[in-house]
Amino acid sequence: MAKIIKFNEEARKKLENGVDVLSNTVKVTLGPKGRNVVIEKSYGSPLITNDGVTIAKEIELEDPFENMGAQLIKEVATKANDVAGDGTTTATVLAQAMVKEGLKMITAGSNPVFVKRGIEKATKKAVSILETKSKKIAGNSEIAQVASISAGDEEIGNLIAKAMEKVGENGVITVEEAKSLETTLEVVEGMQFDKGYISSYLVTDPERMTAELDDPYILITDKKISNMKEILPVLEATARSSRPLLIIAEDIEGDVLTTLVVNKLRGTLNVVGVKAPYFGDKRIGALEDIAILTSSQVISKDKGMELEKVDISSLGSAKKVKVTKDNTLIIGGIGKEKDITSRISQIKTQISSTTSEYEKDSLKERLAKLSGGVAVIKVGSATETELKEKKLRIEDALNATKAAIEEGIVSGGGTVLIEILKEMESFELSGEERIGVNIVKKALTAPLKQIAENAGLEGSIVVEKVKNAESGIGFDAAKEEYVDMIKSGIIDPAKVTRSALQNSASVAALVLTTEAIIVDKPKKEESDTPNMPMMM
């Protein structure tokens, strides 16, 4: 296929246009007075949201050159979301600021490679300063504050703090849609492990790319399943019962996987295959934990058991199983309470007797999964549109809270970035790398400036006031006053800020060093009308 190529400044200008379209759409949502964006859906009601990554994912531009710029910024939001689960709008604002300032410098004749190096070194310095400002989260009140800031709702913040208290920081919290108007918290016994579906063709919800099985049978084996004859009796038995099936195995290979997918697509079987978690002895222990929780047997080669001889009585069950591309969550296993209690005691004994720190951590992780249970936040609302928006906010707040527990908290509302800027005043590099440092320094003011502008104020004036204030004093956009941010409960997870800085700098550096863009030449649409002979 023929290609269209643009070079130099023309190429970078097109990228910048795409960056601006996406960033300008996303950044209106930043801060407590940020606005919402309405997204048309091909079916159902429109989606109203202020979640940066959700908005970014919907944007595709008609001009293929500009679309590349938009897709690069979309990558910033997606990566920030993958790492920290929040801070996608901040990352987008930082990236746009770095790209705009950087392109000005390159148009004026600066060397893009040296500018890129300067950006990378300055970002590394900024992240190291951020780490010194991080403060470990202390108690439920700070957990509630982090969640409240992220969700923009104190009630949601308190609900998440309560959920964390119930299951502990190693427990699992999920968000579901309720059938009532109320948003409630429910704690269910359950277990999650870090393995997702073997094939995406096995999902039950293509929009969210998840598989949900209600009241499934559960087959657990430490073998590779490579021969269809091995599991045919189990498949036939579950098909007759009209219940779904979860298969946990070392692997499901070749023709077996193909057969499962084909039967799933035809509607003959509702089956999901996942790989067994961990390796070696840790895997054996984890599979036994799952078996006890679900009242099943581990079909093991070490025990001389054969899959062909397995019947329904060897399978376990649970109220619900949720599988994503990365995780499997088993809720409401039918295992006997005394067996689970006995297993927990056994693991506790192993923890106290082992001298290996690695093994101790591994056993503690298994203990948390077996005893922690699952907290389910059921989101209620009057309309479907509001329900979707509220669910997204709760998911963001949950991610922000987990990030805060991992790496601590810092002053929120863009304040910590201004504090980093103050400490970076003396940080200089030689030659054109200095330009990269200045680009990062200027970008650090962008989130606070945008928060103030979204509140209807002059952003640059607010930035100067915070710059000249004492350490820790920032701008509370909700009340439009200058306060001690941490004391006022306006805090951000350090991980979210770090991820936003690193991802925005990475993509900005890519845009600035781009010298050519190549896209496919669109095909000319041929007219369906046949050529008519000329009339004489």
UniProtKB/Swiss-Prot annotation:
GO terms of biological process kind: protein refolding
On the tree of life, the source organism's domain of life is: Archaea
Q: Where in the cell is it found?
A: Cytoplasm
Select a single GO molecular function from the record's annotations and give it: ATP binding
Q: What class of enzyme is it?
A: isomerase
Could you name the Gene Ontology cellular component terms for this entry?
Answer: cytoplasm
- How does this protein assemble? Forms a cylinder of 14 subunits composed of two heptameric rings stacked back-to-back. Interacts with the co-chaperonin GroES.
The protein's matches in HAMAP family, at most eight in alphabetical order, are given as: CH60
Q: What does this protein's UniProt record list under function?
A: Together with its co-chaperonin GroES, plays an essential role in assisting protein folding. The GroEL-GroES system forms a nano-cage that allows encapsulation of the non-native substrate proteins and provides a physical environment optimized to promote and accelerate protein folding.
The name of this protein is Chaperonin GroEL
